[in-house]
Structure formats: structure tokens, C-alpha cells
């Protein structure tokens, strides 16, 4: 039985995964919420209004 050279299969496998990641990465990033520190800092500095339960 002849021995197969694994090199082209590794390159095909890696290339296909890279193409898949490049295509899917913007779609995945659009679903992840943005965790930039400026937004968190702005949210911490602005006071949140409190609605009192007895009013």
C-alpha cells in the first residue's frame, strides 16, 4: 500500500479553516457586545435615577 504525503492535506485543512474564520469573524463580532472601557467609565460616572417604591 503506498504511503500518502500528508503535507497537501494539512495545507488544505489549514487554508479552509482560515477562509472560514475570515468569512465568519465579522458575523461573530457583530453578535458580541462591545466592552470598550470608555463606555463602562461613562456608565459609572453618570448616576442612575432611583425610583422610590413608596412614591
From Swiss-Prot:
GO MF terms, alphabetically ordered: proton transmembrane transporter activity
Main location (coarse class): mitochondrion
Keyword Transport among UniProt keywords: yes
Annotated compartments: Mitochondrion membrane
Gene Ontology cellular component annotations, sorted alphabetically: mitochondrial membrane; proton-transporting ATP synthase complex
GO aspect biological process, one term: proton motive force-driven ATP synthesis
Membrane topology note: Single-pass membrane protein
Alphabetic keyword roster: ATP synthesis, CF(0), Hydrogen ion transport, Ion transport, Membrane, Mitochondrion, Transmembrane, Transmembrane helix, Transport
Family the UniProt entry places it in: Belongs to the ATPase protein 8 family.
Protein name: ATP synthase F(0) complex subunit 8
Species this chain originates from: Pelomedusa subrufa
Amino acid at each position: 500500500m503506498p504511503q500518502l504525503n500528508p503535507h497537501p492535506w494539512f495545507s488544505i485543512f489549514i487554508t479552509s479553516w482560515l477562509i472560514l474564520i475570515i468569512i465568519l469573524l465579522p458575523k461573530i463580532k457583530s453578535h458580541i457586545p462591545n466592552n470598550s472601557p470608555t463606555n463602562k467609565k461613562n456608565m459609572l460616572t453618570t448616576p442612575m435615577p432611583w425610583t422610590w417604591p413608596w412614591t
